[in-house]
Amino acid sequence: MKLSFLDPLYARPGPWAAVYLDTSRDIEDPEKAIELRWRHLRDALSGQGVDNATLSALHTAVGSDREVSGRHGQALFAAHGRLGLAEELPEPPAADSARFTSIPDVLPLALQHAPDIPYVAVALSRAFAETDLEEDVVVHYQAGRWPMSRVAPEPRYNHIGAARDWPANAFAVAHELENLRRWTDAETIVLRCAAEDVWLRGVLVNHLPESTQQHVVTVPDSGRPVAGPGRALLEAELNDTLRATVNEQDRTLTHRYMAQRARHPDTSEGLSAAITALQRGQAHCLLLTRPVNLPESLWAGPEPTHITLMEPDLHSFGVHTGRQEPAGAVVVRALVGTGAELITVPREELSLEDGVGVLLRYHDPYT
């Protein structure tokens, strides 16, 4: 998974105030609940030395996701009186948190972006026209990147036409779907239709290129709404289909990692090996097992590659005034700063020393 969405947070210096809070709308009086949550977090930040201008910038953003229904959260980052990044979270944080650190505490946000699968969702159904008893074919479709699109959906497109004209209309819809798939590099098309509408599905899929047809996954029409306010089209069906998968790039990198580990186990897994690779700019990607179990903190210097387990180790970089920072923040800064990627895998699928593995850009024969 590429981490370029975090670039704005490294474009200007900290310290950064990072807030993760539950902003779910599936409770009674959510505005009051969010206000109370924010009040506690604001007090915590104030106690950590956050200035009033930065607190004000965060206050303006808290709860601004009112158009998103259901369970979700927010991740907010601000420094020097300016909001640096605000994102909705598909899952509310297990516990609200507020930290004021030199390096932005972004690992919880990065983990919610995974597995970052590009897709196109299609809902295909029949409906009776309002003016007569003639049936219409109704198509809704939308691209996205799972799972962040659950709460930050892309534009939705719609097509309604007479069922008798479907063979001709399906050609145009298939053309639009293929263009959308190519534009977004979608790896799968999740198509929902009723069992009795197999003909509608067949006509549509047969108009897609053969290379695209093999990426179509058909799911039954459960009768659930195609989407809630501010939510992704076919969210429930996408969750069932994509929650246990990874994107194609991450799958390829994981296979490469397994081959590397078989040849060079000592430099391929464990926190120490990963830190060494990050110090050298040698890491192509970092693998973390879920749930993530990094230490509470690491030592950091002013540059992304200044990352160590112990403070004296910073001296080799000429750094004599290092600081302890949240381990996840230091690791992700090193990944972004060296152009490395992040992959998360369930612990039961891949056992790694310290829950950490590193795929190297090159192997140093002297290590």
Task: Describe each PLM feature range.
Residues 1-367:
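Terminal alpha-helical anchor/extension segments at protein ends
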